[in-house]
Amino acid sequence: MSASSAQTETPERYFLKVASANPFNPLILIDYGLPRAAKAIVRIYTAEGRVVNTLVNDTQPAGNYTLAWDGTDRNGTRVGSGVYFIMLETPEYSETKKIALLR
C-alpha cells in the first residue's frame, strides 16, 4: 500500500526520513522531499537486496511527500518480520533508510 501526497512548501534539498515508529507494525510512514521536479523511485528492499515493492516510480514536481507502506509486497502479500530498506532514487540523489517490521 502506498499513498503519496505533495505538501505546499518546496524543500531546499532532497531528503528521505522515516516519519513513524521504527520498528513498525502494521504501517510505516515515509517522508521524502524533492527540491525540483525529478524522476523519483521509492522502493522497499529485503536485507539481501531483493525488491519487495515499488511505492513510487514517476516524475514528480518539487515538494514534500508522505508515503505509507503496510508491509506488503508488489502482489499485496504480507511480508514477514525482518529488516528492510527504503531507498529514494533520483537522477541526482539517492538515500537509503533501514526499517524493521515486527509481526
Q: Which residues does each PLM region occupy?
A:
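Surface-exposed loops/turns
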Residues: 25, 36, 61-62, 75, ...
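Glycine-centered coil/turn sites that cap beta-strands in beta-rich domains
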Residues: 2-46, 54, 66-69, 90
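Solvent-exposed serine/threonine-rich low-complexity stretches and specific carbohydrate-binding patches
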Residues: 52-60
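C-terminal tail/sorting-segment detector
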Residues: 2-6, 59, 67, 77-103
